[in-house]
Amino acid sequence: MPEINFAQIEYAVRLILEAIGEDPNREGLVDTPKRVAKMYAEVFAGLQEDPKQHFQTVFSEEHEELVLVKDIPFYSMCEHHLVPFFGAAHVAYIPREGKVTGLSKLARAVEAVARRPQLQERITATIADSIVEALEPHGVMVVVEAEHMCMTMRGVKKPGSKTVTTAVRGVFETDANARAEVLSLIKA
């Protein structure tokens, strides 16, 4: 993946400022192109990461029951409008043959996937698929809830509305009780 081109971003931001009728040389804006480039490097850092890398450390435990990390806060940037959306991810999996990962690794994978121009549906599926590929669990269920600024500050202008997406893999695809257990624990 190519590195962030700071100079190109700075140039583009100057063009945007000029295109909306602003003076990029006025006091409050003179450093804005540099700040935006630095911010993009941070908020799009996930482009440089493979979420599966966070699951390289695994532990062998005699545990094949549900593991759920809920309310993992995240932010991302809508790839359609380049405005933020943010919310919480809930990640559940059922280990196979005692193959578990550190709980923080689930949160790190969420962050790696979210920190790129993205769609919420893709975040949800990519997290689930990364866990399946890396840990080979009996099942994975990911639920993502988010508020999208593209619906809050433009277009329909509906602040507070949330989008919920799910991805189910393995036993969660066929076992309604397993899905219901995860959903009830998320609400608890």
Curated annotation (Swiss-Prot):
Keywords: GTP-binding, Hydrolase, Metal-binding, Nucleotide-binding, One-carbon metabolism, Zinc. GO terms for biological process: one-carbon metabolic process; tetrahydrobiopterin biosynthetic process; tetrahydrofolate biosynthetic process. Pathway: Cofactor biosynthesis; 7,8-dihydroneopterin triphosphate biosynthesis; 7,8-dihydroneopterin triphosphate from GTP: step 1/1. Its EC number is 3.5.4.16. It comes from the Bacteria. It holds the Pfam family GTP_cyclohydroI. GO terms for cellular component: cytoplasm. The keyword Lipid metabolism does not apply. One of its GO terms (molecular function) is GTP binding. Signal peptide: none annotated. Zn(2+) binds at residues 78, 81, 150. It catalyses: GTP + H2O = 7,8-dihydroneopterin 3'-triphosphate + formate + H(+). Belongs to the GTP cyclohydrolase I family. Toroid-shaped homodecamer, composed of two pentamers of five dimers. This is GTP cyclohydrolase 1. It comes from Geobacillus kaustophilus (strain HTA426).
